């Protein structure tokens, strides 16, 4: 049984170090503690707290107010002791936010925490669990978008990006899906029907609607990354900075990012993973091109770490992956947001029927056993946090036509 810390101890021993870790220096210029939301003037940035002689048990106080560079509030943090459910502070924190909203006319984000779990309440009152609180730069961008956000379902789709009717319909479906408040979408389209173009058109629509500014495109093969970068971002957003993430390539100031799962999951010195170079609120939209089924992120750590709209692109998933993929993207009744299969595409004359030759190989028939691989390949497995002695994958994983 763990030690039951008081709220004060929880803040000092757990919450303060987490805030410091993501860039909020408690006791510093941009973090105000024990702020009275009624007596403070958020317009003139005069924050009234306990230090001015007000009794803690008489007036209500915001545990933490996080400030932007101009010292205006951009988020509040409601803390509870470790033994209390995080959600217990939600009603209280919404009251504090209303006090701020009366003065500033905006709904700033709320973070709820007991030190072990963090929840985020956005301006639409949607609560969801997040890995960590967001840093100042990301909160600034999120609030800026929030002030200008429009309904993505009303955005005009760019015909230069998608011109086929089924592609246009796919883009509309996803934009309408996000318009209804969903945060994940799964686009299931047969190979060769234009998934990447559909994804780029969705990105374009969300940017026009001020729902997204920073986008991460995740792939499991370098060739897919090159396709997204060259035929997508460079072609349709020529004036926007693009960053291809790798061991040498890292920036937090680009608009579009392309990365393999392998890069994001690679270990960094002295500790941590590459993706942890970014804050949890670093991206407004993440597109996973088949990468959500990658062996390199079997626990979906990347998916869980970032708080963003998320789109999965996939051809027909294999039967053993289908359930997990649909659950990951919160597909209602086990159906993807968009489905355009091979035979639909053949009937639309987008694809032509194939004639396949079946070629049998040892890999297809026997699969792969890590302990039978060469030392070089076993070492490659270890770099991806797989244990060669126990690693096995069936040959069906590699069946392609």
Q: Predicted segments — roles?
A:
Residues 276-312:
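SF2 helicase catalytic motif II
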Residues 323-401:
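Interdomain helical connector at the RecA1-RecA2 junction of SF1/SF2 helicase-like NTPases
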Residues 1-76, 80-214, 219, 223, ...:
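ATP-dependent helicase/translocase motor core
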Residues 202, 229-231, 243-246, 271-274, ...:
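Short beta-alpha junctions and helix-cap segments that line functional grooves
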Residues 86-94, 258, 285, 293-296, ...:
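Amphipathic alpha-helical transducer elements in NTP-driven molecular machines
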Residues 82-84, 116-119, 222-224, 262-266, ...:
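Conserved nucleotide-binding/hydrolysis micro-motifs of P-loop NTPases
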Residues 270-284, 293-295, 323-338:
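Substrate-gripping "pore-loop 1 plus following alpha2 helix"
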Residues 245-257, 277:
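Conserved motor-coupling elements within RecA-like helicase/translocase cores
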């Amino acid at each position: 049984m763990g030690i039951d810390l008081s709220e004060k101890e929880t803040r000092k021993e757990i919450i303060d170090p987490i805030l410091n870790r993501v860039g909020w220096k408690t006791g510093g210029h941009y973090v105000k503690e024990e702020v009275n939301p009624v007596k403070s003037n958020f317009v003139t940035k005069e924050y009234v707290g306990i230090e001015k002689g007000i009794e803690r048990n008489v007036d209500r106080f915001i545990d933490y107010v996080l400030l932007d560079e101009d010292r205006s509030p951009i988020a509040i943090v409601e803390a509870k002791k470790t033994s209390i459910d995080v959600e217990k502070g939600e009603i209280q924190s919404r009251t504090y936010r209303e006090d701020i909203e009366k003065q500033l006319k905006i709904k700033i984000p709320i973070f709820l925490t007991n030190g072990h779990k963090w929840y985020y309440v956005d301006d639409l009152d949607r609560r969801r669990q997040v890995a960590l609180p967001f840093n100042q730069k990301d909160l600034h961008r999120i609030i800026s978008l929030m002030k200008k956000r429009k309904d993505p379902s009303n955005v005009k789709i760019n015909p230069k990006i998608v011109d086929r009717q089924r592609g246009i319909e796919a883009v509309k479906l996803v934009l309408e899906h996000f318009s209804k408040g969903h945060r994940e979408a799964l686009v299931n389209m047969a190979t060769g029907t234009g998934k990447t173009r559909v994804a780029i058109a969705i990105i374009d629509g969300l940017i026009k609607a001020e729902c997204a500014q920073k986008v991460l495109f995740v792939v499991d093969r370098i060739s897919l990354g090159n396709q997204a970068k060259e035929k997508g971002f460079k072609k349709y957003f020529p004036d926007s900075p693009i960053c291809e993430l790798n061991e040498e390539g890292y920036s937090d100031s680009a608009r579009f990012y392309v990365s393999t799962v392998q890069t994001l999951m690679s270990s960094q010195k002295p500790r941590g993973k590459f993706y942890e170079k970014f804050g949890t609120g670093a991206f407004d939209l993440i597109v996973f091109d088949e990468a959500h089924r990658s062996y390199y992120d079997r626990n979906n750590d990347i998916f869980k770490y970032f708080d963003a709209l998320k789109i999965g692109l996939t051809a027909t998933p294999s039967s053993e992956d289908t359930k997990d993929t649909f659950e990951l993207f919160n597909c209602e009744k086990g159906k993807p947001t968009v489905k355009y299969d091979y035979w639909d595409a053949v009937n639309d004359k987008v694809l032509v029927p194939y004639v396949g030759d079946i070629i049998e190989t040892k890999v297809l028939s026997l699969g792969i056993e890590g302990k039978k691989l060469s030392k070089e390949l076993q070492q490659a497995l270890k770099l991806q946090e797989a244990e060669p002695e126990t690693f096995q994958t069936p040959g069906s994983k590699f069946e392609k036509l």
